[in-house]
A protein has these predicted regions:
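Membrane-water interface segments at transmembrane-helix boundaries in multipass membrane proteins
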Residues: 58-120
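Short, small-residue-biased leader/transition segments that mark boundaries at the very start
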Residues: 2-9
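A short secondary-structure junction motif
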Residues: 8, 83-87, 175
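Alpha-helical transmembrane segments of integral membrane proteins
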Residues: 20-53, 69, 98-213
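N-terminal signal-anchor/first transmembrane alpha helix
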Residues: 1, 14, 44, 52-66
Length: 213
């Protein structure tokens, strides 16, 4: 597509729907990969607080937060796609999105998107779990005869996850809105390309439709 000029709304909607699946998929994949890794790193850092594991994870988080996401995306593209050749530079053009070829071609963009989620959830989980572990009810659980491991898994983990899990939906929505540049960089034929084209070709009707999304 090279641009959509002002036309009937049904046509605009059909073009939008046709380009929606790649955008949805890369964001679902990035959430499914980024959230568990971030939670795991945060849990390890909290349980090993002030030990070498915690320090290594904190350095990793600081690097991910400090380096601009576009730089990380360029590094992923250069190292894994260009130098090592593990992944194609652009997404496969196949219409069947649920094949290994298409999934493999999406992975560089997925990794670029999920790095921010990993850093955010690791930091958030570490903070929440560390606070819970020092709470009075943990001492009470130990006095009732629970071992340290039992107190952590039955009480600390449960209470910290109650706060963390509601943010997963908002995380998905925020990543969905921030995948525009990533789609363009990795040749993902999704909504991001349409959005940029609507600006380039001054198609205001289409721009308003995409902005609503």
């Amino acid at each position: 597509m090279t641009g959509v000029q002002t036309c009937a709304l049904p046509i605009l909607w059909q073009v939008f729907v046709n380009h929606l699946p790649p955008t949805i998929l890369i964001n679902i994949y990035s959430t499914l990969i980024g959230v568990p890794i971030g939670l795991a790193l945060g849990i390890i850092a909290a349980l090993k607080k002030n030990k070498w594991q915690d320090q290594v994870i904190n350095i990793f988080i600081i690097l991910l937060i400090s380096v601009p996401s576009i730089v990380l995306a360029l590094m992923i593209q250069y190292v894994f796609c260009f130098k090592l050749g593990w992944f194609p530079l652009t997404m496969s053009t196949s219409d069947d999105y649920f094949t290994w070829e298409v999934f493999r071609s999406m992975l560089p963009a997925v990794f670029a998107l999920c790095l921010g989620s990993i850093a955010g959830y690791a930091r958030y989980t570490r903070a929440e779990l560390s606070e819970v572990l020092t709470g009075e009810f943990m001492l009470l659980a130990r006095t009732k005869g629970l071992t340290k491991k039992q107190a952590i898994y039955r009480h600390a983990m449960r209470n910290s996850m109650v706060v963390i899990f509601p943010s997963i939906l908002s995380e998905f929505i925020s990543v969905l809105s921030g995948s525009l540049i990533i789609e363009k960089m990795f040749g993902i034929n999704g909504v991001g390309g349409l959005y940029l084209n609507s600006i380039t070709f001054q198609d205001y009707d289409f721009f308003m439709l995409l902005s609503g999304f």
